[in-house]
Design a protein with these regions (language model features):
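N-terminal pre-domain/capping segments
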Residues: 1-83, 265-278
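Charged helix-capping and loop-helix junction motifs
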Residues: 23, 78, 101-108, 133-134, ...
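Acidic/histidine-rich catalytic cores of soluble enzymes
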Residues: 115-201
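A short, acidic, amphipathic alpha-helical segment used as a generic capping/interface helix at domain edges
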Residues: 168-171, 207-228
Length: 278
């Protein structure tokens, strides 16, 4: 990722948040930059022309991928490095692996990241090796070098974290929070993984405050580490075709572009709070 002598927050737009006809157009990069984003995240590996078009506007670029076997970590890391990406967020495994298989995957991710000099952030995503908070905590204890992408809605909604005390569960996952170097931003409630949060006011949406608590802790942990790169906060509000955005009477619940800007506002507030606590 981009070298820096100071800690900083960089807000990236995940291109999967935009309609297909929009995010395949280089014109979208201008709108993204004008909205205040400093980079973009590609879902699939684009052509080099696309990468260069973003970079020509001063936008950072990162990518994503999936690793199903140890060898896949090295192939993906090399492809990401060759594409000029700053980092990759990765889905690893399917969540059905035993501990020995999980350990082999984790070791390969770490080795591939070091070999190709590109951060590989393992996502806290359903249907992956980090789908469960207990296993995630145990894994980072065994592999403290593992870097993690905080895709918190998968845990918050998928594991119904409010049931049994969300504060206790946030405390429990602290060892994972300390390893998080990337955030995929969407906010869910206990029943739906992606919901309209209005202007971000938590007075009537207490789940917003829960996400902000986690994000602030993630930023605090980042600020305690050596300043080697900026922190990537990637807005990732996905469409109804994959059952993320909700629809009512054939219309999406909210404007995902506008909601992404609310998430950016919350991220900056959380980062400032973390800086004040440092």
């Amino acid at each position: 990722m981009t070298n820096s002598v100071t800690h900083s927050l960089g807000c990236y737009m995940n291109l999967g948040s935009l309609e297909a006809s929009v995010h395949t157009s280089d014109a979208s990069f201008h709108a993204i930059r004008e909205a205040g984003y400093v980079g973009v995240q590609f879902g699939d590996f684009p052509t080099q022309d696309r990468v260069q078009a973003a970079q020509a506007l001063g936008l950072g670029v990162c990518g994503s991928g999936r690793i199903n076997a140890p060898a896949g970590a090295f192939a993906l890391a090399q492809k990401g490095a060759d594409s000029g990406f700053e980092c990759l967020t990765v889905h690893v495994g399917w969540g059905m692996e035993d501990d020995a298989e999980v350990d082999r995957l984790a070791a390969a991710v770490i080795e591939a990241s070091q070999k190709h000099r590109i951060p590989l952030y393992v996502e806290t995503h359903r249907a992956t090796i980090l789908q469960d908070i207990w296993r995630a905590v145990q894994l980072v204890k065994r592999f403290p070098e593992l870097e993690v992408n905080c895709d918190f809605s998968h845990w918050y909604t998928g594991l119904e974290m409010v049931y049994g005390g969300v504060e206790k569960k946030i405390e429990f996952i602290h060892p994972v929070i300390e390893r998080m170097g990337f955030i995929h931003a969407r906010i869910g409630n206990p029943g739906c993984i992606q919901v309209d949060i209005g202007d971000g006011d938590s007075a009537t949406r207490p789940y917003v405050a829960h996400f902000c608590t986690v994000w602030t802790q993630v930023f605090s942990a980042y600020l305690k580490r050596p300043a080697t790169h900026r922190f990537c906060f990637g807005t990732e509000l996905l469409g109804p075709e994959i059952y993320y955005a909700r629809t009512f009477n054939g219309k999406e619940e909210s404007d995902r572009w506008e909601q992404a800007l609310v998430l950016v506002k919350l991220a900056n507030e959380c980062f400032s709070k973390a800086q004040g606590q440092a």
